[in-house]
């Protein structure tokens, strides 16, 4: 719109999730008119991240080194392994500060419609890891979508001979949630997964 370089900046900002044409233009204009030093710092941080951040060899999350800090931490419980779809899921669980085990990132979920099979995910490495390490409980923390449920079931079948306990995250009523606002599927799951007080 203004110049070819401006248009290129807008185009690249639009690759971010949730950023449309107008938002990308506003961001570009903001960086160029008011925040040039921060824009340069952003460009440098992005360049370094894209060059230096790699996939952890053990858990497949992101790391600055071959093995991420979570996998290197000797205070973590090796008997607990939490399986998630993405590195974003690792960050979400870590923010709760309630889990002290290890992680394994699948790299997505099974989705025949999208052409994603077990061969496209890190499932083979997961089975190998469970066979080699002292994992007593495998926690399946995949999404509650049909694809997430299918992925959890597939993994459960694949590792059942190698792990004592395979569990799934509880599903149901969120904290502070009102029953009348829940969809029937969520409420049904909550009824099936009720617990003792």
Curated annotation (Swiss-Prot):
Keyword Metal-binding found: yes
SUPFAM superfamilies found in the cross-reference section: Recombination protein RecR
Keyword match DNA damage: yes
Molecular function GO labels: DNA binding; zinc ion binding
Protein's GO biological process: DNA recombination; DNA repair
Function description: May play a role in DNA repair. It seems to be involved in an RecBC-independent recombinational process of DNA repair. It may act with RecF and RecO.
UniProt-recorded name of the protein: Recombination protein RecR
């Amino acid at each position: 719109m203004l110049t070819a370089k401006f248009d290129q900046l807008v185009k690249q900002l639009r690759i971010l999730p949730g950023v449309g044409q107008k938002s990308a233009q506003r961001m570009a204009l903001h960086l160029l008119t008011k925040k040039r030093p921060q824009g340069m710092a952003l460009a440098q941080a992005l360049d370094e991240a894209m060059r230096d951040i790699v996939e952890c060899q053990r858990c497949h999350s992101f790391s600055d080194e071959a093995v991420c800090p979570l996998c290197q931490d000797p205070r973590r419980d090796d008997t607990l392994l939490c399986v998630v779809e993405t590195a974003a899921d690792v960050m979400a669980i870590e923010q709760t500060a309630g889990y002290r085990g290890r992680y394994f990132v699948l790299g997505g979920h099974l989705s025949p419609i999208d052409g994603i099979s077990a061969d496209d995910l890190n499932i083979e490495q997961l089975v190998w890891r469970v066979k080699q390490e002292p994992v007593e409980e495998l926690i399946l923390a995949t999404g509650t979508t049909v694809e997430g449920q299918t992925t959890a079931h597939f993994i459960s079948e694949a590792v059942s001979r190698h792990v004592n306990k395979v569990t799934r995250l509880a599903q149901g009523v969120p904290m502070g949630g009102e029953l009348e606002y829940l969809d029937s599927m969520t409420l049904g799951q909550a009824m099936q997964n009720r617990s003792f007080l």
